[in-house]
């Protein structure tokens, strides 16, 4: 696209946001309830949150750079950047937060079958299904591929037994994308990236209470859980190839950097540096303290990106424990 085309898109985007983003959705996020996570049992905190989500869903802006066929808006990367900038300019809250968007979606776009993309990506984009990630295990520590959760091959399905830990919001998730050992003889090429419903018989969760009193993480138990190898025509119950799930996990890791960057700092227009220039902050001490906080936030983002770059470089080495298990 030419510069003039992009500027026209910016003007159109700015106009759309002014018309569709309610004032209540331009306030800072104070807690998890301020962001809509979607899912089978989800509810909206306010009419404004519902209106903002529905406007973005209908426009394809919950996943703006995904193809339109899978619920996105089909934006190019430059257009997507402009949309993020314009949303940051008005401090717009995310219309939908989802591990399906940040993690599973990119993996399905790269490795998934057309049937998987049509089903799962559209469900994610519409906020219909909430996903969690099953990676870390109590006995694995930093050596993630030493996992013991095992899927016994029963022909058209697996019977899975094992335990995951530090599973973010497993108690509120509908489905899980889960690393399961399916070949005990091959450490790296004996893992399958499975997809299954958290309501399957044998799946249970136990929240882990932190010192803060919050419980964003869970232990997840799988006791004789039946995981189908297929959910219908061209919809395998796993991503990529059987016993090659490690390839999918490594690819997915690259997209965790984007999530950490987004939560750690995001667009500079929304950083505290923009806040310190507002008329209400006349106290020089407060301005200095907020400026230092902003520097810390920028440093955190830079260190997060460096961490993820180093982690991605360790292609065949054991992963350190994920920030978001």
Residue ranges and their predicted role:
Residues 1-98, 118-126, 286-291, 298:
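Amphipathic, small/basic residue-rich leader segments at the start of a protein or domain
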